[in-house]
């Protein structure tokens, strides 16, 4: 499991290469402590795209969509690096 701080959210990403959908995302709102989303994805790209959409859907406060995208891009780069280190790229 890898945990990412994404502005007012926390994303926990789980990876299991033996599953059809190897990536699992748990998205939490840090302000309320609520779990907002659980999803299963095929690729890092799909996971990051859907994380960005979920963050925009759940905004209770006016976050800048560009800042949201940049935070998700940092997560994407970290996941690609992790996949490379694990030899899964």
Name the predicted role of every residue range:
Residues 1-36:
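Amphipathic, interaction-prone secondary-structure segments
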Residues 37-89:
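Mixed-charge, Lys/Arg-enriched low-complexity segments
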């Amino acid at each position: 499991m890898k945990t990412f701080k994404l502005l007012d959210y926390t994303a926990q990403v789980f990876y299991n290469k033996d599953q059809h959908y190897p990536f699992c995302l748990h998205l939490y709102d840090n302000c309320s402590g609520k779990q907002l989303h659980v999803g299963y994805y095929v690729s890092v790209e799909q996971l990051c795209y859907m994380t960005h959409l979920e963050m925009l859907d759940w905004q209770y406060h006016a976050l800048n969509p560009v800042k949201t995208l940049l935070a998700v891009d940092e997560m994407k780069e970290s996941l690609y690096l992790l996949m490379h280190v694990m030899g899964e790229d």
